[in-house]
């Protein structure tokens, strides 16, 4: 080996750098454990402790010191599946941005294009591109984007803006830039909010130019609070309100009109005695007061007063909103009331007639106008602080600028004179609607009070200070993981990694003896380098990432196996140990096979990295780094010890008594079996396609959208019971499966997954709690059921949501990833082997493997005791199978190419058969180490990745079969008769 000293120098330097980088992870972990001990389960106390020592020196290397914040920045970060917390993807509404840029244009072509873009957006297409396509189709050249009533409006004119003379292509560039600026503005606002929220090491990043923003909050536990914080647009407005006596006649008339379409004769409900029902009591038609005869009024659960029209149950708000949007109801509003805007207040808890605590929400009617503009906008607010009102209750005080102070004085003066109320509205929710009893308020200071707690006022002040979002931000994908579940994942991953390392190391020693020890040392160094690189690049370690590390231990010895097997062959051919080592490490020896196998593997890993997201990207990261470090340690580190052994004149045989005669003089007619293997594989493909057509696949929420909950109970529970209970409240959409132990369920539903905003999320959580709490002992509250906390054992341990548009993007990415990986590998092999027949054989084998795995999943998902969903994890498994199947195939093909170009005697089929037989030890050993580590991961890796590992396990097994019985026979059958005769003539002459 040339430059041995230089390699040793770099290896030692790399090892020292890796240890240095990993030291930060150990120090950070120790400090965090101290914080947990100090907080004793209080997450807020834990965060405050870590914040307080952020600038303190916690790591002294003698020549330099590091603060806790610096140490945290350099550690290996754990993903949410290991740390716990919440991960969301927010979709900034490009539709709202375009409306704003057009000044809410009424142009029919423009608005139809907005609607068409929403309906027809293709997977992986941005909304803006979909809008441009729709506008081109709808306008057909008759309407320009630079029209005065679209984008050539006053607000977009001027330098860098839109003028009337511009073409659509020019306007598109400007609008694209303006949209990017708005998303950037949203990104900045969200970062300000998150920085003040109080979690350690939050992560926020834009996802390409899709208008999507990824937010990760490790360790965050209050789910509903976080979603409110992220989704609030902070659109603060001040509206004048109607009083109940002013709007009461409309409510009466609406109730009468609704009776014609909504009343059910079997419905019997008591009429609540509130101010509205009192109005009704004076009506001439006393029949209206009969129980169950009031579609609108029967839904009132408590009386209102002043600006509050009544209190309703949150579950009825959607129905009532639908009533007020109906044209036949709106027409009942007289005069200026026709512009009235009906909005809800914040949810509070009240006592019903039986004294039971129930949720209630207040209904308000705001004094609207033709342009739907509030009396005052919240843009005048310059500062906001959480404080306490005169009664000592939590509130938020606001300070306005000069213009705002003047407008506020006018507005409060008018309210004082008219004895009316001013509603303080944030994102179409009324937080308070105070009256003005002491005259106009000067100075621009105001206060928001209501049924708040201290946490709510802190968040509200935070949102107002950070500023408003330029458009609505909807959570299109989310995942919530409890810290206890994360600890279980760490334990499972650690156990499987240790056991996998032990088994692989033991096998290498049993099979290769002393040389196996050298491979094991290289494996240990490989793991050090791998973790060192992960720490240095700031990678996030996820559970699939741990699986990638365990797989790396299987692949790390592959190169050693190929080299050792070649060395054994050279020794059997009578060469000296030095000659055998030199040959096996040469391009003519093992290097060509190692290069081709790993390049194909790297290509599929790169595709996985590009198209994957979240944990899957973490898997791809560890896999790619592991391939590179494995190559370095297998080729150079193990070689250093081998050369050291040779220099000491020690014997090295690469075999033990156990393995000495295994696969020696192995002769099997692989090509003679091709008729049977073709028949078997054709039957498998037919069965797979038949099952796919009849049974389909169990597509996960990643591909079809939906909500998934992992819920643990105190004792075993029947899935059918839970399914029947939830189907009643989720409109028939509830799939319930046992997940791991029989007291843990995986519940999937599409109920309201398309509805934006946090209200739908909260409704689903509350419906889950209300319908499942009967299966728990008394004392389980909604907060304990939904939110995460240290030591949580029951309730929702993990929850995820994937919106339908994101699901379509993921599915599109998955198709392109698989097809792209196969195309790239086909091209590489064709270039490397210079014959398309090699590529065809390899791709046919890979396609066979993919179809086989899909067929198994289609046939078995209904009765297997673990999840077999087709999701991002499954696609990662398929791409990994493609890589490893190629690995096996390349080992065989490389020997075939060598023998066909060499002097081996025999017919074409005999030469190819001999090629396959001489690679059996390599093929079986490389596959066996992979199968062993996958089995370990399958048994000990945890329920959440069992289906993912199973796909790889089946794929590796069938991939080994296809390399021997599909790829090579196809290669032989597609080579022309003339080429075969040329080879046979050459070998006879040799």
What is the meaning of each model-derived region?
Residues 8, 525, 532-533, 569-585, ...:
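Hydrophobic alpha-helical transmembrane segments of membrane transport and translocation systems
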Residues 216, 444-447, 455-503, 767, ...:
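Juxtamembrane "pre-transmembrane" interface segments
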Residues 1-72, 76, 99-108, 114-136, ...:
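Interfacial helix-loop-helix hairpins and adjacent transmembrane helices
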Residues 3-4, 396-397, 401-418, 422-423, ...:
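Interfacial segments of transmembrane alpha-helices in multi-pass membrane proteins
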Residues 190, 484-504, 523, 573-613, ...:
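Pore- and gate-forming transmembrane helices of large, multi-pass membrane proteins
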Residues 552-573, 594, 631-636, 879-903, ...:
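Short helical (or helix-break) motifs at transmembrane helix termini and adjacent helical loops
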Residues 22-31, 51, 55-63, 71-435, ...:
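Non-transmembrane, solvent-exposed regions of membrane trafficking/translocation machinery
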Residues 12-15, 424, 516-538, 549-556, ...:
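Small-residue-enriched core segments of transmembrane alpha-helices in multipass membrane transport
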């Amino acid at each position: 080996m040339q430059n041995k000293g230089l390699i040793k120098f770099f290896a030692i330097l790399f090892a020292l750098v890796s240890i240095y980088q990993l030291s930060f992870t150990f120090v950070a972990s120790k400090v965090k454990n101290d914080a947990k001990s100090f907080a004793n389960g209080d997450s807020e106390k834990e965060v405050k402790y870590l914040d307080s020592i952020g600038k303190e020196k916690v790591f002294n290397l003698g020549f330099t010191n590091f603060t806790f914040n610096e140490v945290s920045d350099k550690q290996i970060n754990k993903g949410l599946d290991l740390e716990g917390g919440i991960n969301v993807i927010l979709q900034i509404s490009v539709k709202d941005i375009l409306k704003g840029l057009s000044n809410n244009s009424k142009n029919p072509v423009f608005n139809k294009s907005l609607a068409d873009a929403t309906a027809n957006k293709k997977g992986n297409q941005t909304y803006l591109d979909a809008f441009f396509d729709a506008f081109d189709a709808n306008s057909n050249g008759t309407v320009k984007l630079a029209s005065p009533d679209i984008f050539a409006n006053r607000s977009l004119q001027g330098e860098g803006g839109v003028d009337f003379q511009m073409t659509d292509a020019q306007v598109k560039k400007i609008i694209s830039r303006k949209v990017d600026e708005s998303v950037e503005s949203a990104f900045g606002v969200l970062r300000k909010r998150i920085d003040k929220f109080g979690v350690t090491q939050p992560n926020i990043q834009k996802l390409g130019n899709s208008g999507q923003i990824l937010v990760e909050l490790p360790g965050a536990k209050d789910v509903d609070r976080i979603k409110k914080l992220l989704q609030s647009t902070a659109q603060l407005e001040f509206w004048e309100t109607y009083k109940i006596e002013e709007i009461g006649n409309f409510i009466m008339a609406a109730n009468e009109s609704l009776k014609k379409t909504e009343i059910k004769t079997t419905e019997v409900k008591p009429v609540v005695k509130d101010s509205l029902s009192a109005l009704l009591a004076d009506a001439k038609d006393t029949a209206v007061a009969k129980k169950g005869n009031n579609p609108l009024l029967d839904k009132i659960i408590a009386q209102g007063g002043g600006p509050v029209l009544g209190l309703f149950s949150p579950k009825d708000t959607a129905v009532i909103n639908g009533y007020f949007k109906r044209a036949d109801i709106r027409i009942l509003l007289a005069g200026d009331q026709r512009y009235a805007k009906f909005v809800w207040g914040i949810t509070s808890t009240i006592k019903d007639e039986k004294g039971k605590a129930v949720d209630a929400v207040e209904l308000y009617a705001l004094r609207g106008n033709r342009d739907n503009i509030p009396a005052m906008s919240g843009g005048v607010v310059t500062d906001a602080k959480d404080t306490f009102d005169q009664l000592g209750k939590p509130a938020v005080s606001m300070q306005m600028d000069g213009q705002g102070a003047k407008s506020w004085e006018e507005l409060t003066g008018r309210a004082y004179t008219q004895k009316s109320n001013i509603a303080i509205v944030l994102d179409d929710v009324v937080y308070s609607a105070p009256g003005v009893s002491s005259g106009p308020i000067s100075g621009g200071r105001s206060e928001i009070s209501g049924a708040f707690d201290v946490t709510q006022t802190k968040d509200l002040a935070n949102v107002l200070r950070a500023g408003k979002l330029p458009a609505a931000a909807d959570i299109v994908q989310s995942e919530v993981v409890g810290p206890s579940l994360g600890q279980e994942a760490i334990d499972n991953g650690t156990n499987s990694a240790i056991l996998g390392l032990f088994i692989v190391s033991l096998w290498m020693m049993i099979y290769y003896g002393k040389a196996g020890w050298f491979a094991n040392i290289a494996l240990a160094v490989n793991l050090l380098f791998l973790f060192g690189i992960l720490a240095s690049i700031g990678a996030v370690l996820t559970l699939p990432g741990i699986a990638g590390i365990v797989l790396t231990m299987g692949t790390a010895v592959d190169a050693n196996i190929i080299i050792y097997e070649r060395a054994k062959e050279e020794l059997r051919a009578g060469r000296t140990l030095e000659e055998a080592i030199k040959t096996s490490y040469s391009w003519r020896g093992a290097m060509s096979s190692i290069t081709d196998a790993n390049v194909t593997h790297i290509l599929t890993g790169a595709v996985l990295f590009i198209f994957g997201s979240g944990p899957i990207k973490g898997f791809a990261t560890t896999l790619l780094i592991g391939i590179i470090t494995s190559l370095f340690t297998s080729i150079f580190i193990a070689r250093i010890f081998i050369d050291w052994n040779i220099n000491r004149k020690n014997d090295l045989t690469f075999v033990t008594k156990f393995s000495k005669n295994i696969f020696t003089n192995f002769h099997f007619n692989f090509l003679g079996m091709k008729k049977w293997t073709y028949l078997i594989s054709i039957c498998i493909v037919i069965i797979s396609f038949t099952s796919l057509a009849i049974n389909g696949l169990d597509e996960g929420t990643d591909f079809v959208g939906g909500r998934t909950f992992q819920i643990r109970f105190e004792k075993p529970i029947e899935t059918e019971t839970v399914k029947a209970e939830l189907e009643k409240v989720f409109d028939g959409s509830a799939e319930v499966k046992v997940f791991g132990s029989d007291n843990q369920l995986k519940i999937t539903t599409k109920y309201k997954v398309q509805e934006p905003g946090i209200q739908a999320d909260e409704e689903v959580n509350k419906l889950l709690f209300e319908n499942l709490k009967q299966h728990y002992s008394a004392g389980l509250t909604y907060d304990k059921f939904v939110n995460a906390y240290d030591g949580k054992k029951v309730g929702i341990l993990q929850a995820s949501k994937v919106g339908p548009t994101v699901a379509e993007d993921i599915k599109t990415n998955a198709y392109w990833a698989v097809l792209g990986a196969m195309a790239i590998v086909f091209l590489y092999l064709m270039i490397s082997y210079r014959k398309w027949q090699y590529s065809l054989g390899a791709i046919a084998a890979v396609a066979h493997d993919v179809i086989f795995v899909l067929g198994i999943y289609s046939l078995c998902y209904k009765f297997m005791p673990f999840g077999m969903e087709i999701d991002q994890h499954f696609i990662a498994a398929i791409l990994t199978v493609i890589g490893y199947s190629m690995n096996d195939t390349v080992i065989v093909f490389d020997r075939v190419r060598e023998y066909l170009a060499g002097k081996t005697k025999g017919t074409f089929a005999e030469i190819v058969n001999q090629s396959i037989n001489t690679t059996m030890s390599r093929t079986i050993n490389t596959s066996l180490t992979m199968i062993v580590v996958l089995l370990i991961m399958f048994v000990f890796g945890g329920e959440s990745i069992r289906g993912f590992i199973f796909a790889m396990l089946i794929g590796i097994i069938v991939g080994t079969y296809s390399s021997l019985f599909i790829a090579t026979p196809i290669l032989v059958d597609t080579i022309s008769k003339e080429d075969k005769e040329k080879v046979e003539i050459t070998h006879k002459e040799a």
